[in-house]
């Protein structure tokens, strides 16, 4: 996805191609997590990065995908936006209004948690399910009253002007993005997966050690203005990819339960069944 900084930089610098010259590396971009996990489930791709919600929907639908790692949370990189002159001043004011977001995305979770914090239910708003590009158009045209979205779309809207941040992810206790793979692939390629993820962490570190060069490269690759990329980097913490520990798994379980309670997923899921842990042997093979 456009927001996967480490992956985009790794691709731009051909880090995986250099690390694994005998392997054929293919890169595929998706507009959002749900579409990516569909491709992962049918074997079109081997590894993908997505927000916290798409894996829950995929698991509920029976996809045999596993969480192989997680990034730290980025609470400042995901927001609910309203027009600058909107009468909506608080999340509670969203009651009865149209809110655009990608169904089954991390922004879906941001919205649900923000509503709960404000004493509202999901049924108190008018959800409008749209892809980021379509949501942006609907928001700009005034066809929806608010837009829950992640970076870099958020930074692009912010710098274009005429918007106000109603709420970001601060104090909403979300996880960071996850990396997922099909279970059979993960079980057979553990060492390779670990090496790939380590490469992504190295690539992400370039946003700090080579900030200006990285901004220029990301702007060119993503087709976005450099100020948008700079804003996005300012919204995110250093991103080192780590295994999914018990605390993260428990937080993701809380999220899954929240979506089930709101009848947004058809059945309960057990996140612990989908956590993949590299073995010591696989670690030594690196």
Residues covered by each model-derived region:
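Short loop->beta-strand "edge-of-pocket" segments that line small-molecule binding or catalytic clefts
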Residues: 1, 92-104, 201-205
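A bilobed periplasmic-binding-protein/Venus flytrap-type ligand-binding module shared by bacterial periplasmic
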Residues: 9-10, 78-88, 176-191
């Amino acid at each position: 996805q456009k927001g996967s900084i480490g992956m985009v930089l790794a691709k731009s610098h051909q880090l995986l191609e250099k690390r694994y010259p005998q392997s054929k590396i293919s890169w595929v971009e998706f507009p959002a997590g749900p579409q990516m996990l569909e491709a992962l489930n049918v074997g079109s791709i081997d590894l993908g990065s997505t927000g916290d919600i798409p894996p829950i929907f995929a698991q509920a639908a029976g996809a045999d995908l596993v969480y192989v790692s997680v990034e730290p949370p980025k609470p400042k990189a995901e927001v609910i936006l309203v027009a600058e002159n909107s009468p909506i001043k608080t999340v509670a004011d969203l009651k009865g209004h149209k809110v655009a977001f990608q169904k089954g995305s991390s922004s879906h979770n941001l919205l649900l948690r923000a509503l709960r914090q404000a004493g509202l239910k999901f049924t108190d708003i008018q959800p409008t399910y749209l892809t980021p590009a379509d949501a942006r158009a609907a928001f700009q045209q005034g066809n929806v009253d608010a837009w829950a979205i992640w970076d870099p779309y958020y930074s692009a809207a912010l710098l274009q002007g005429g918007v106000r941040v109603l709420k970001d992810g601060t104090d909403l206790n979300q996880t960071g993005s996850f990396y997922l793979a099909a279970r059979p692939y993960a079980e057979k390629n553990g060492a390779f997966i670990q090496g790939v993820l380590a490469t992504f962490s190295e690539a992400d570190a370039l946003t700090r050690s080579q900030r200006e060069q990285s901004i220029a490269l990301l702007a060119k690759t993503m087709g976005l203005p450099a100020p948008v990329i700079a804003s996005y980097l300012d919204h995110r913490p250093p991103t080192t990819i780590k295994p999914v520990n018990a605390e993260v798994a428990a937080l993701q379980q809380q999220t899954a339960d929240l979506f089930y309670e709101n009848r947004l997923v058809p059945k309960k899921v057990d996140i612990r069944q989908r956590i993949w842990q590299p073995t010591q042997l696989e670690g030594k093979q690196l």
